[in-house]
Swiss-Prot record:
Role noted for this protein: Catalyzes the conversion of N-acetyl-diaminopimelate to diaminopimelate and acetate.
TM helices/strands, residue ranges: none
GO molecular function annotations of the record: N-acetyldiaminopimelate deacetylase activity
Catalysed transformations (reactions): N-acetyl-(2S,6S)-2,6-diaminopimelate + H2O = (2S,6S)-2,6-diaminopimelate + acetate
Family: Belongs to the peptidase M20A family. N-acetyldiaminopimelate deacetylase subfamily.
GO biological process, alphabetically ordered: diaminopimelate biosynthetic process; lysine biosynthetic process via diaminopimelate
EC number: 3.5.1.47
Presence of the UniProt keyword Translocase in the record: no
Organism: Oceanobacillus iheyensis (strain DSM 14371 / CIP 107618 / JCM 11309 / KCTC 3954 / HTE831)
PANTHER family: N-ACETYLDIAMINOPIMELATE DEACETYLASE (PTHR11014:SF98), PEPTIDASE M20 FAMILY MEMBER (PTHR11014)
Matching NCBIfam families: amidohydrolases
Identification of the protein by name: N-acetyldiaminopimelate deacetylase
Keywords from the named record: Amino-acid biosynthesis, Diaminopimelate biosynthesis, Hydrolase, Lysine biosynthesis
Length: 371
């Protein structure tokens, strides 16, 4: 192979960028793609993403493979010699490996074309605000719309040499949650002259939990998490404002809407009870990832035939993935790729084993060539 995949992964790891800001990443990817492109390859840009069309010899279908390209707002703490050069930004979810694997598979296909057409989708903004849906709806994507699509995600808890998937629900429906409270601040000695938003927000967090525990079918599998709370600025003053940030997750798409409806009603009640103003923003919303059973079975069969990669049955997870928006319209599946890291996803010390890159390339190529 012309491409040095380990070095590419390290280069990409050093330049993590947030959603729809992946300008350096896009330029780097285009440079590598153009190094290996031949006359049977077409390239399109969409926003900060890229679409690469590899024309087959006698196409009966279009196969799509998606790799997400954005990083996270995390300060890296790996102490690696190729750690992030962008302070406060890190590839802490493995998207550097995803891109590298896609490039490796792309080069193999260019060197040894198959009958079918293959579209490689380098998608921005998976971590937020969500790039899959607008990319899916774009003219560029629709012109090359695949007949099936698949993608992978690194799994720190799985050993290198292992892949994992399942038919049906793999990832949950998710929604971001941002709630702002505004009341009246003042001196801590005169609470009766204020509207204390620390108290209001604190009680709101407690009441939120009852939406799931007492308002939804416990078999639905839903959870509301408040991961961040801000209020006040000094110990002897009552907070005029407060902010809650969190997520809503459910294995049932209808349950997400029900939670939001109940939350809106709760919010109106709190505005009356605490004589304040409350505003809510649901941010990015990701549709559940539902794997097509036929393609998952095909993938399992293909992997078992390799004799070098182990297939493992996966469990559904409450994590969110905007690839669900693509699978809502295009049949396909997603699978986990073992990378054997002591630290998990979104951890500042995540350090996937680079041996997983070749495993990922082989798994992707095995699936693409199995049609």
């Amino acid at each position: 192979m012309m491409l040095q995949l380990e070095q590419i992964r390290r280069d990409l790891h050093q330049i993590p960028e947030l959603g729809f800001q992946e300008f350096k990443t896009q330029a780097y990817l285009l440079e590598r793609i153009n190094e290996i492109a031949t006359e049977n390859v077409e390239i399109k840009k969409w926003s900060t993403g890229i679409l690469v069309y590899v024309h087959g010899k006698s196409p009966a279908r279009k196969i799509g493979f998606r790799a997400d390209i954005d990083g996270l707002p995390i300060l890296e703490q790996t102490n690696l010699p190729y750690a992030s050069l962008h302070e406060g930004r890190m590839h802490a979810c493995g998207h550097d490996l995803h891109m590298t694997i896609a490039l490796g598979a792309l080069e193999k296909l260019i060197q040894d074309p198959i009958n079918d057409d293959v579209i490689f989708v380098f998608q921005p903004a998976e971590e937020g605000p969500g790039g899959a849906k607008p990319m899916l709806e774009s003219e560029e994507f629709q012109q090359w719309k695949p007949d099936m699509m698949f993608a992978l995600h690194i799994a720190p808890e799985l050993p290198v040499g292992t892949v994992s998937s399942k038919a049906g629900l793999l990832f949950a429906n998710t929604s971001e949650l941002f709630i702002d409270f505004e009341g009246v601040g003042g001196h801590a000695a005169y609470p009766h002259l204020t509207k204390d938003m620390t108290v209001a927000a604190s009680n709101f967090v407690v009441q939120l939990q009852q939406i799931v525990s007492r308002g939804l079918n416990p078999l639905d599998g839903s959870v509301i998490t408040i991961g961040k709370m801000e209020s006040g600025y000094v110990q002897n003053a009552i907070a005029e404002t407060a902010r809650l940030e969190g997520t809503i997750r459910s294995t049932d798409a209808d349950a997400i809407d029900m939670i939001k409806s109940k939350l809106n009603r709760l919010m109106k009640g709190f505005e009356i009870s605490y004589d304040c103003t409350i505003k809510v923003d649901y941010g990015a919303n990701y549709y559940q990832v539902v794997n097509d059973a036929t393609y998952v079975q095909q993938f399992e069969n293909v992997i078992n035939q390799t004799q070098t990669i182990t297939y493992q049955q996966a469990d559904a997870a409450m994590t969110g993935e905007d690839f669900g928006d693509m699978l809502k319209e295009i049949p396909g599946f997603m699978f986990w790729l073992g990378v054997d890291s002591s630290y998990g996803l979104h951890n500042a010390r995540l350090n996937p084993k680079e041996e997983a890159i070749d495993v990922g390339v082989n798994a992707v190529i095995s699936m693409i060539t199995s049609f």
